[in-house]
């Protein structure tokens, strides 16, 4: 696991625990987003996500962490000029109408600066994943997406 992940993982673990255990926290994450009306009270797809992500073998990191785009030119979700290749975490929610939302979570440490094009790349990558999940065997099918950024006030 990269050094950054090991530093961020305790925070991401806490976020994941909240998302997996509390509808209130899931609702809080999507409140104020375009997904709010459709996904309030949605179920979390823990077992489905784990099964898809670990279908070949269990990885070192948690099943919800570090969704990589790929470093080669074949990655259609790479953003021109940006060095960002991954989403720190993705959580999948199913609405009462059986639609699925991918909640892409990005984490920045206090006083950590954004790289060139990094904040702009988050929603573009999430949108790309929603259009290309059928070619990504470890990404759950989903209809909609949002990005959520956890960071210090100084980062904004």
Where does each model-flagged region fall?
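Charged, terminal alpha-helix-loop-beta segments
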Residues: 1-156
């Amino acid at each position: 696991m990269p050094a950054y992940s090991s530093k961020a993982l305790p925070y991401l673990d806490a976020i994941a625990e909240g998302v997996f255990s509390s509808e209130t926290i899931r609702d809080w994450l999507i409140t104020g987003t375009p997904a709010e009306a459709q996904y309030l009270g949605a179920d979390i797809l823990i077992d489905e996500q784990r099964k898809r992500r670990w279908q070949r073998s269990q990885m070192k990191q948690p099943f919800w962490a570090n969704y990589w785009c790929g470093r080669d030119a074949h990655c259609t979700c790479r953003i021109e000029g940006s060095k960002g290749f991954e989403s720190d975490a993705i959580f999948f929610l199913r609405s009462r109408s059986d639609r699925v939302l991918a909640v892409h979570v990005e984490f920045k440490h206090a006083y950590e600066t954004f790289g060139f094009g990094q904040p702009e790349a988050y929603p573009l990558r999430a949108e790309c994943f929603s259009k290309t999940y059928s070619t990504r065997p470890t990404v759950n099918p989903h209809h909609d997406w949002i990005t959520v950024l956890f960071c210090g006030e100084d980062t904004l």
